[in-house]
Amino acid sequence: MKKWQLFGTTAIGASLLLGACGGGGNADSGKGEGEVKGDGSSTVGPIIEKLNEKFAKDNKDVTVSSGTSGTGGGFEKFISGSTDFSNASRPIKDEEKKKLDDKGIKYDEFKIAQDGVTITVNKDNDFVDELTKEQLKEIYSGKAKTWKDVNPKWPSKEIKAYSPDQSHGTYDFFTEEVMDKGDIKAEKNADTNVIVQSVQKNEQGIGYFGYNFYEQNKDKLKEVKVKDDSGKTTEPTKKTIQDGSYALSRPLYIYTNEKKLKDNKGFQDFMKFVLEDKGKSAEDAGFVALPKKDYTEQQSKLDDIIGKDSKKDDDKDSK
């Protein structure tokens, strides 16, 4: 029987711990065992949860846990060596790479899904249908105090801007893509659900977060189209997010500790499952799968990292 246990890790989430059920065995017979620990992005968290649910069915001797302390918080734990993998909604930063290098930790990057940072306003807002990146920058830099400051045709009502806090990869992505690395002046919160609720309650509210959060709350919020640098206006949909035509599309990642991956058959089995799933769990969680060839290419990359011995074990196990 599958067991679920929740352990609070931060204000924004909890660690999901799954004791798997199904086939038996140990490392010698080709089956993994033991613990696999992760942490990181609250955006990626629901995908890992869906993957764990499926993986648990055939891997009773492997326990996978994953916290949601944010991309930055996840990397801190990854750098300290307390986790085997780190979930991220942005690429690893140079300073994080350096810290890993200083500790002699080799890591590998895997893309597992595609997301689109979605801009939303209050459901009763009847004038904001689209925004340029420059207008978003004016709002989130504090330069535009009222909607009229953004567009002379809009009402002179004070804007209430909401944002994830600095622990989120979504914050870093927005800072990079929209703010040109400038400061965000908005009411920040570690809990994305609080941002959703704030925009819902405030008629002059505006907020941003991952596409799946919008999908879960689209009956409560109004989505805003984004005009890219070429002047093309696009709304976030599964198609525009996957093909990258939506201006705020981004990949979602799992970073793995290479030594721990090589030493832990259960970890290897989990990562193989992640890639063999080919984005089905991401779609189940409201995200967008990568093109199938991307998963196939990364499966080859994983095989190269793990080595031929692991592949032989799998061949034995399947006979």
UniProtKB/Swiss-Prot annotation:
CDD domains, per database record: PBP2_phosphate_like_2
Region (Disordered): 25-44, 61-98, 297-319
Compartment(s) where it occurs, according to its Swiss-Prot or TrEMBL record: Cell membrane
Lipid-attached positions, N-palmitoyl cysteine: 21
Signal peptide interval: 1-20
Organism listed in the record: Staphylococcus saprophyticus subsp. saprophyticus (strain ATCC 15305 / DSM 20229 / NCIMB 8711 / NCTC 7292 / S-41)
UniProt keyword Hydrolase present: no
Matching SUPFAM superfamilies: Periplasmic binding protein-like II
UniProt family annotation: Belongs to the PstS family.
Lipidation (S-diacylglycerol cysteine): 21
One Pfam family from the record: PBP_like_2
GO CC annotations on file: plasma membrane
Keywords linked to the UniProt accession: Cell membrane, Lipoprotein, Membrane, Palmitate, Phosphate transport, Signal, Transport
Entry-linked Gene3D superfamilies: Periplasmic binding protein-like II
Protein's name in the database: Phosphate-binding protein PstS
Subunit structure: The complex is composed of two ATP-binding proteins (PstB), two transmembrane proteins (PstC and PstA) and a solute-binding protein (PstS).
GO biological process per UniProt: phosphate ion transport
Database matches in InterPro entries: PBP_domain, Phos-bd, Phosphate_ABC_transporter
Membrane topology classification: Lipid-anchor
Feature: compositional bias, Polar residues: 80-89
GO molecular function, one term: phosphate ion binding
Role noted for this protein: Part of the ABC transporter complex PstSACB involved in phosphate import.
